[in-house]
């Protein structure tokens, strides 16, 4: 498992693009038994209405673009899982994440 701090993260959903505001985020890449999966953990989100919106819908698919703290760009698609109580979210990857 490899973890990368995320400096910037933008999600695209329902024809809109939103740069996420948070206190900490990390990209996690899990490689096990010949397969890879990835997800992004996001903590301290200040966009409460965005968390609420995703909590109220079953349309949670997003495209995302990000930059790790060391400047590596990444893009992929995934599913946005909000945690309103803790002002947090997780994006579970739905496709390969090129370059990782």
Description of each model-found segment:
Residues 17, 26, 46-48, 70, ...:
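Residues that cap or initiate secondary-structure elements
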Residues 1-34:
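Solvent-exposed edge beta-strands and adjacent loop segments
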Residues 5-14, 55-69:
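Short conserved beta-strand and strand-loop elements enriched in small hydrophobics
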Residues 39-41, 63-65, 88-90:
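Beta-strand secondary-structure signal
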Residues 22, 67-97:
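Short beta-strand and beta-hairpin "edge-sheet" elements
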Residues 35-53, 98-99:
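Charged, amphipathic alpha-helical segments
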Residues 2-5, 45-47, 79:
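Signature of dsDNA virion morphogenesis modules
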Residues 28-36, 80-87:
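Short, ordered beta-strand-loop transition motifs
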């Amino acid at each position: 498992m490899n973890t990368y701090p995320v400096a910037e993260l933008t999600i695209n959903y329902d024809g809109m693009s939103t740069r996420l505001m948070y206190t900490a985020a990390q990209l996690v890449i899990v490689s096990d038994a010949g397969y890879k999966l990835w997800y992004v953990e996001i903590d301290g989100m200040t966009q409460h209405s965005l968390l609420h919106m995703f909590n109220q819908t079953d349309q949670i698919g997003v495209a995302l673009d990000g930059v790790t703290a060391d400047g590596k760009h990444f893009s992929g698609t995934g599913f946005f899982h909000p945690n309103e109580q803790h002002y947090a979210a997780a994006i579970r990857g739905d496709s390969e994440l090129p370059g990782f």
